[in-house]
Amino acid sequence: MIKHKRLRRASALFAALSALLLSGCAPSAASDSALPALTVGSDTYPPYVYMDNNGDITGLDVEIAEEAFRRMGYRAEFTTIDWEKKTELVDSGEIDCIWDCFSMEGRENDYQWAGPYLVSRQVVAVDAQSGIETMSDLAGKTIAVQATGKPEAIFLRGGADVPAFRNIISLADRGVQYAMLDCGYTDAIAAHEEAIRQYMKDYGANFRILDEPLLVTGIGVAFSKNDTRGLAAQLNEVFEQMREDGSMEKLVGKYLDDPAHSLEVDALEQ
């Protein structure tokens, strides 16, 4: 009988200790959820931002944002937006920032920027069996791009360094351009290189990326020009910390097969 009492006491003590240990592990998640939220406007753009099999938003930019904002005393709350209305949304305060592999090139004066925190190449992809080998081969061809994206701006701007294409198809849903190339409805597409590679990996698409990039650019986080909270400056400081302590490299390596090029931010300034 005494042994049974001791056993029950030991079991109760173990249960109490377990509860204490579990409650000790919980504050991190609980404290994060209690932090004030910053609403991040984004679009679906694997591997940077996408929905996993559980229906949760994840990706490289999501994890960087969560870690960076946590260090600033905030939590990141991602929301999918109409990409064509991104500037209107951030200026109205409906979202706090735009964060989704967002190219800074040519938009330097449109927002308050944090970044660049990574490097991205804007490239052209064609069907693997296509006879298009160089940019000059795009003359007379149809190219699909995302509306208001950087490739659209490059092609519509024109110039000596831009091929004399026949037609540009601008799409509100950036994912549609991949399907169009896959089905032969366009001769080429233009987008961030890692996004194209992710589509090829996920769907087994037989694309070929042209060697010559359209643009090598820094990607950043855009806040409204009228924002007075100093968030862009704080985020720049955190990005520097994350580069120095290796956490940025660790996160990039989790999503990209060859992370080294994406981390060469300093080379952009040379």
Give the positions of each predicted feature:
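Extracytoplasmic small-molecule ligand-binding "clamshell" domains
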Residues: 31-101, 170, 234, 245
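Ligand-binding cleft/hinge of the Venus flytrap
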Residues: 51-54, 65-74, 151-172, 200-204
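C-terminal motif of bacterial Sec signal peptides marking the signal peptidase cleavage site
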Residues: 21-24
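Short helices/loops that flank or line small-molecule/ion binding pockets
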Residues: 70-71, 79-80, 84-97, 112, ...
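Periplasmic-binding protein-like
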Residues: 42-44, 119-126, 197, 201-240, ...
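Extended ligand-binding regions for polar small-molecule ligands
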Residues: 26, 62-71, 132, 136-137, ...
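Acidic, polar ligand-binding/catalytic clefts
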Residues: 66, 75-137, 208, 213
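A ligand-binding cleft/hinge motif common to bilobed small-molecule-binding domains
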Residues: 85-88, 101-110, 154-159, 180-182, ...
